[in-house]
């Protein structure tokens, strides 16, 4: 896709990213754009340690957090750290799908007084699983404006899960891909227990068509600085499908 192909060269620009010293070694925060930060948290899944990436935006009204730290033990450390740095509180939290590395902080942020959001589809899944839910829900696509900051939540279709959405920050041309976008160093599609692999390719193409001028893509796990993630995701899907076909 024009605008996403060749984004590897942009990775050179990441060498100047500012990394903040955190008290919790399982939390890392890096400045991506003027008021947009990537936060990475670490947790163990089936005996292997993984990194989960998401972002927060500092606005004139307060801080908007997309997704949540991966693991309850990191919630307070995370909010303490960003308050210490910015002197502002979290006023909004949006979960990009129902898994714990995305929706796990809804209850915590809600108790802090933040407005919490998810799609109705995510809310339905959380309800069935008896997990904490967002206070506010919306249909698959929604535009937000917080102070002077505008961003958009977009549902591209099924992929990693039925309910996965992405978040677009138009001013910064940053796409928060969540778990539907695999990192450039991913060896496979990861957890696919709730995936719709046959729909995944079209959903990625929908993202490409919707946001043709992306400059930075933040993949949901592992190395988000490798800007080949969109194409690599398509390659991984194709590889998986070929293996499945060969085994049948």
Swiss-Prot record:
Example of a GO MF term: beta-lactamase activity
EC annotation from Swiss-Prot or TrEMBL: 3.5.2.6
Protein name: Metallo-beta-lactamase type 2
GO biological process: antibiotic catabolic process; response to antibiotic
Keyword entries, A-Z: Antibiotic resistance, Hydrolase, Metal-binding, Periplasm, Signal, Zinc
Chain's gene name: blaB7
SUPFAM superfamilies per record: Metallo-hydrolase/oxidoreductase (SSF56281)
Cofactor: how and how many bound: Binds 2 Zn(2+) ions per subunit.
Keyword Translocase among record annotations: no
Top-level taxonomy: Bacteria, Pseudomonadati, Bacteroidota, Flavobacteriia, Flavobacteriales
Location of the protein in the cell: Periplasm
Catalytic activity of the protein: a beta-lactam + H2O = a substituted beta-amino acid
Cofactor field: Zn(2+)
Oligomer and partners: Monomer.
Positions that bind Zn(2+) 1: 97, 99, 160
A GO cellular-component term linked to this record: periplasmic space
Binding site for Zn(2+) 2: 101, 179, 221
InterPro entries: Beta-lactamase_class-B_CS, Metallo-B-lactamas, NDM-1-like, RibonucZ/Hydroxyglut_hydro
Major localization class: periplasm
Signal peptide: 1-21
Function: Confers resistance to the different beta-lactams antibiotics (penicillin, cephalosporin and carbapenem) via the hydrolysis of the beta-lactam ring.
Family as reported in the entry's similarity comment: Belongs to the metallo-beta-lactamase superfamily. Class-B beta-lactamase family.
Gene3D superfamilies: Ribonuclease Z/Hydroxyacylglutathione hydrolase-like
Pfam family for this entry, one: Lactamase_B
Keyword Transport: no
Binding residues annotated for substrate, in chain numbering: 182
């Amino acid at each position: 896709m024009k605008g996403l192909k060749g984004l590897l060269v942009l990775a050179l620009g990441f060498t100047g990213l500012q990394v903040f010293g955190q008290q919790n070694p399982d939390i890392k925060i890096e400045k991506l754009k003027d008021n947009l930060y990537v936060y990475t948290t670490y947790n163990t899944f089936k005996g292997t340690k993984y990194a989960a990436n998401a972002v927060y935006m500092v606005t004139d009204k307060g801080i908007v957090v997309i997704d949540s730290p991966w693991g309850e033990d990191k919630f307070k450390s995370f909010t303490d750290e960003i308050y210490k740095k910015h002197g502002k509180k979290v006023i909004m939290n949006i979960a990009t799908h129902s898994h714990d590395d995305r929706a796990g902080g809804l209850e915590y942020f809600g108790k802090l007084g933040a407005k919490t959001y998810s799609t109705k589809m995510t809310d339905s899944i959380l309800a069935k699983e008896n997990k904490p839910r967002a206070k506010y829900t919306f249909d698959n696509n929604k535009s937000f404006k917080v102070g002077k900051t505008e961003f958009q939540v977009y549902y591209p279709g099924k992929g990693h899960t039925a309910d996965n959405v992405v978040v677009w920050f138009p001013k910064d041309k940053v796409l928060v891909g969540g778990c539907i976008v695999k990192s450039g160093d991913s060896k496979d599609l990861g957890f696919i227990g709730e995936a719709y692999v046959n729909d995944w390719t079209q959903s990625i193409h929908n993202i490409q068509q919707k946001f043709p001028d992306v400059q930075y893509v933040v993949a949901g796990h592992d190395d988000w600085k490798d800007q080949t993630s969109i194409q690599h995701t398509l390659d991984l899907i194709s590889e998986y499908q070929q293996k499945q076909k060969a085994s049948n």
